[in-house]
Amino acid sequence: MTGCCTVLGAFLFEYDTPRIVLIRSRKVGLMNRTVQLLILAYVIGWVFVWEKGYQETDSVVSSVTVKAKGVTMTNTSKLGFRIWDVADYVIPAQEENSVFIMTNMVITMNQTQGLCPEIPGKTTVCETDANCTAGSAGTHSSGVATGRCVSFNGTLKTCEVAAWCPVEDDTEVPKPAFLKAAENFTLLVKNNIWYPKFNFSKRNILPNITTAYLKTCIYDAKTDPFCPIFRLGKIVESAGHSFQDIAIEGGIMGIQIKWNCNLDRAASFCLPRYSFRRLDTRDLAHNVSPGYNFRFAKYYSDLKGAEHRTLIKAYGIRFDIIVFGKAGKFDIIPTMINIGSGLALLGVATVLCDVIVLYCMKKRYYYREKKYKYVEDYEQGLGNQMEQ
């Protein structure tokens, strides 16, 4: 109990104040200056020069529009001679911050609603009607089973379904890609950015770009780094992939536009930087459900009014435009905050040197005596002197 009272009394009735002691030691002095120099180098070099700690920052607000250009032709036994332009291979016509270019397809023509044999599979091949369950519709079924086992070809029978007939057969994807010439199609990317905190706006079609230049330029990282027109093959190649390979089963490519702007400089120095990467992960060792595809249909009616459709399973490349960046401009508040933080960090040198001097050096007990001085209360000390 007495010990607790002593500790409590010491806490309540004692006061400590810093005492300046000048220690003439080469080791301690050199260490102190070294730590101070390191802190100054960090504050000046990293905080102010590299991280621009004297600036207020803002994130980019962006809008993007994409326009595709290019035309090609095909001549096949199924479709005959055909010209393909933007309205044929850009599906849908407009998307938010992205565009889909169809490069390959499986076409099932002249479908009508009726009864027909299902495509052969583990659950659809049959020998008798007993092998088929009427009314069943599996996840991968083309229609609803009727319960009948019918001839698929001369040697094979499958369960009959009520569906759009003939049903689609997508077991084999065309190789090479149906629209392999899409490698030379181009994308015009128009990007407008805005930093609301600074009321600063700009677009990637720079002021020095003329109409004549825009009609002839194609983006190249070395010769035309600010041309907003990109060749599809070059985009895929820059991401480290082969266009003809990805065109077969499709994929997702990212066009990244980086806007990092120092608004303490002229607006002409605020420029877009382009980079490219494939966004859908492709694992060759586990190549399950690769690529990118979807289905759509074109409907029409014959002279008798019967509804028909052409079903297209479209494989292609979706180009996502990803815009990011930040802008900075001088502001007194972050400047003063970082200066104050830097000055506070200088105190670390004193604390570190105190620890070395008072607890690690051979003469630590001597330095402790010089560092700390115990003084009694003035009135109590005066009373003790009078008694003596």
Swiss-Prot record:
<feature type="binding site">
    <location>
        <position position="293"/>
    </location>
    <ligand>
        <name>CTP</name>
    </ligand>
</feature>
<keyword id="KW-1015">Disulfide bond</keyword>
<feature type="topological domain" description="Extracellular">
    <location>
        <begin position="55"/>
        <end position="338"/>
    </location>
</feature>
<dbReference type="GO" id="GO:0051899">
    <property type="term" value="P:membrane depolarization"/>
</dbReference>
<feature type="binding site">
    <location>
        <position position="67"/>
    </location>
    <ligand>
        <name>ATP</name>
    </ligand>
</feature>
<feature type="binding site">
    <location>
        <position position="313"/>
    </location>
    <ligand>
        <name>CTP</name>
    </ligand>
</feature>
<dbReference type="GO" id="GO:0098794">
    <property type="term" value="C:postsynapse"/>
</dbReference>
<feature type="glycosylation site" description="N-linked (GlcNAc...) asparagine">
    <location>
        <position position="208"/>
    </location>
</feature>
<feature type="glycosylation site" description="N-linked (GlcNAc...) asparagine">
    <location>
        <position position="110"/>
    </location>
</feature>
<dbReference type="GO" id="GO:0045296">
    <property type="term" value="F:cadherin binding"/>
</dbReference>
<dbReference type="GO" id="GO:0034405">
    <property type="term" value="P:response to fluid shear stress"/>
</dbReference>
<protein>
    <recommendedName>
        <fullName>P2X purinoceptor 4</fullName>
    </recommendedName>
</protein>
<dbReference type="GO" id="GO:0010524">
    <property type="term" value="P:positive regulation of calcium ion transport into cytosol"/>
</dbReference>
<keyword id="KW-0458">Lysosome</keyword>
<comment type="function">
    <text>ATP-gated nonselective transmembrane cation channel permeable to potassium, sodium and calcium. CTP, but not GTP or UTP, functions as a weak affinity agonist for P2RX4. Activated by extracellularly released ATP, it plays multiple role in immunity and central nervous system physiology. Could also function as an ATP-gated cation channel of lysosomal membranes.</text>
</comment>
<feature type="binding site">
    <location>
        <position position="293"/>
    </location>
    <ligand>
        <name>ATP</name>
    </ligand>
</feature>
<dbReference type="GO" id="GO:2001028">
    <property type="term" value="P:positive regulation of endothelial cell chemotaxis"/>
</dbReference>
<feature type="disulfide bond">
    <location>
        <begin position="126"/>
        <end position="149"/>
    </location>
</feature>
<dbReference type="GO" id="GO:0005524">
    <property type="term" value="F:ATP binding"/>
</dbReference>
<feature type="binding site">
    <location>
        <position position="313"/>
    </location>
    <ligand>
        <name>ATP</name>
    </ligand>
</feature>
<dbReference type="GO" id="GO:0035381">
    <property type="term" value="F:ATP-gated ion channel activity"/>
</dbReference>
<dbReference type="GO" id="GO:0070588">
    <property type="term" value="P:calcium ion transmembrane transport"/>
</dbReference>
<dbReference type="InterPro" id="IPR053792">
    <property type="entry name" value="P2X_RECEPTOR_CS"/>
</dbReference>
<keyword id="KW-0406">Ion transport</keyword>
<feature type="glycosylation site" description="N-linked (GlcNAc...) asparagine">
    <location>
        <position position="131"/>
    </location>
</feature>
<feature type="disulfide bond">
    <location>
        <begin position="132"/>
        <end position="159"/>
    </location>
</feature>
<feature type="binding site">
    <location>
        <position position="69"/>
    </location>
    <ligand>
        <name>CTP</name>
    </ligand>
</feature>
<feature type="topological domain" description="Cytoplasmic">
    <location>
        <begin position="360"/>
        <end position="388"/>
    </location>
</feature>
<dbReference type="GO" id="GO:0050850">
    <property type="term" value="P:positive regulation of calcium-mediated signaling"/>
</dbReference>
<dbReference type="GO" id="GO:0004931">
    <property type="term" value="F:extracellularly ATP-gated monoatomic cation channel activity"/>
</dbReference>
<dbReference type="GO" id="GO:0008217">
    <property type="term" value="P:regulation of blood pressure"/>
</dbReference>
<feature type="disulfide bond">
    <location>
        <begin position="261"/>
        <end position="270"/>
    </location>
</feature>
<feature type="binding site">
    <location>
        <position position="188"/>
    </location>
    <ligand>
        <name>ATP</name>
    </ligand>
</feature>
<dbReference type="GO" id="GO:0097190">
    <property type="term" value="P:apoptotic signaling pathway"/>
</dbReference>
<dbReference type="InterPro" id="IPR003047">
    <property type="entry name" value="P2X4_purnocptor"/>
</dbReference>
<feature type="binding site">
    <location>
        <position position="186"/>
    </location>
    <ligand>
        <name>CTP</name>
    </ligand>
</feature>
<feature type="glycosylation site" description="N-linked (GlcNAc...) asparagine">
    <location>
        <position position="75"/>
    </location>
</feature>
<comment type="subunit">
    <text>Functional P2RXs are organized as homomeric and heteromeric trimers. Forms heterotrimer with P2RX1. Interacts with P2RX7 (via C-terminus); this interaction is functional only in the presence of ATP. Forms heterotrimer with P2RX4; functional differences between homomeric P2RX4 and P2RX4/6 heterotrimer are minor. Interacts with AP1M2.</text>
</comment>
<dbReference type="GO" id="GO:0099604">
    <property type="term" value="F:ligand-gated calcium channel activity"/>
</dbReference>
<feature type="binding site">
    <location>
        <position position="67"/>
    </location>
    <ligand>
        <name>CTP</name>
    </ligand>
</feature>
<keyword id="KW-0407">Ion channel</keyword>
<comment type="similarity">
    <text>Belongs to the P2X receptor family.</text>
</comment>
